């Protein structure tokens, strides 16, 4: 086992991880529920950055809660899928390297 190659590989992985974090911060995902009455947006880090609620829901608290939960769960699932895909892309590139 060549430890110098392992160190080089580790540096490459760390550099790619930094690049992914920067890219994730700049990505935006949105999900709608209730035929678009509620829209939630999140960045690639999973931080909610915007919520839009149609005025017609303001007097129906229960429906608003249900639609918010649905939109939040959907957008967070999108973020998780994207993060997983990006991580697989990075780690997949190192699978064939012989140490």
From Swiss-Prot:
Chief localization: cytoplasm
Keywords, comma-separated and alphabetical: Cytoplasm, DNA-binding
Disulfide bonds: none
GO cellular component term of the entry, any: cytosol
MF terms (GO), sorted A to Z: DNA binding
InterPro entries reported for this sequence: YbaB-like_sf, YbaB/EbfC
Protein location: Cytoplasm, Nucleoid
Signal peptide (from-to): none
Quaternary structure note: Homodimer.
Function: Binds to DNA and alters its conformation. May be involved in regulation of gene expression, nucleoid organization and DNA protection.
Family: Belongs to the YbaB/EbfC family.
Name under which the protein is recorded: Nucleoid-associated protein Cj1642
Organism this protein belongs to: Campylobacter jejuni subsp. jejuni serotype O:2 (strain ATCC 700819 / NCTC 11168)
């Amino acid at each position: 086992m060549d430890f110098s190659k392992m160190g080089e590989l580790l540096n490459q992985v760390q550099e790619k991880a930094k690049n992914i974090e920067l890219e994730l911060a700049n990505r935006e995902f949105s999900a709608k529920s209730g035929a678009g009455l509620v829209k939630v947006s999140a960045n690639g880090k999973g931080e909610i950055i915007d919520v839009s609620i149609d005025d017609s829901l303001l007097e129906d608290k229960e429906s608003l809660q249900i639609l918010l939960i649905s939109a939040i769960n959907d957008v967070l699932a999108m973020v998780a899928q994207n993060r997983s895909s990006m991580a697989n892309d990075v780690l997949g590139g190192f699978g064939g390297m012989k140490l």
